[in-house]
């Protein structure tokens, strides 16, 4: 039986979140054993925030949740790919569909931002 290697990166593994239909990479976040288990049990994506030092469910504030369709691991068992149905217009906290909207072009990083919601309205604190 395969056991995921959470020790290699100090208890965390990268989680690549991908649209289950298009294959588009929506985001990359980190999981520990607890958040992976929560994800598998609830069918919603859960992560560990390194900056806020807390657990969080994708969409808990914005409503843009992710419904898990498939979970895969790589040959080293130290990374997961989670294929999801994105509920709501955007996976990124900036309001963009994907967190990967900055592209290397002609020797510089160019932002191709197309926010689908205003993060200042959604994440009022």
UniProtKB/Swiss-Prot annotation:
Top-level lineage group: Bacteria
Positions that bind Mg(2+): 74, 76, 78
Pathway: Amino-acid biosynthesis; L-histidine biosynthesis; L-histidine from 5-phospho-alpha-D-ribose 1-diphosphate: step 3/9
Any one annotated GO CC term: cytoplasm
Cleavable signal peptide: none
Enzyme Commission no: 3.5.4.19
MF annotations from Gene Ontology: magnesium ion binding; phosphoribosyl-AMP cyclohydrolase activity; zinc ion binding
InterPro entries with a match to the protein in the record: PRA-CH, PRib_AMP_CycHydrolase_dom, PRib_AMP_CycHydrolase_sf
Catalysis: reaction(s): 1-(5-phospho-beta-D-ribosyl)-5'-AMP + H2O = 1-(5-phospho-beta-D-ribosyl)-5-[(5-phospho-beta-D-ribosylamino)methylideneamino]imidazole-4-carboxamide
Subcellular localization, as worded in the UniProt entry: Cytoplasm
Keywords: Amino-acid biosynthesis, Cytoplasm, Histidine biosynthesis, Hydrolase, Magnesium, Metal-binding, Zinc
UniProt cofactor(s): Mg(2+); Zn(2+)
Keyword Zinc: yes
Note on how the cofactor is bound: Binds 1 Mg(2+) ion per subunit.
Family the entry assigns: Belongs to the PRA-CH family.
Assembly, per entry: Homodimer.
Function: Catalyzes the hydrolysis of the adenine ring of phosphoribosyl-AMP.
Name assigned to this protein: Phosphoribosyl-AMP cyclohydrolase
Protein encoded by which gene: hisI
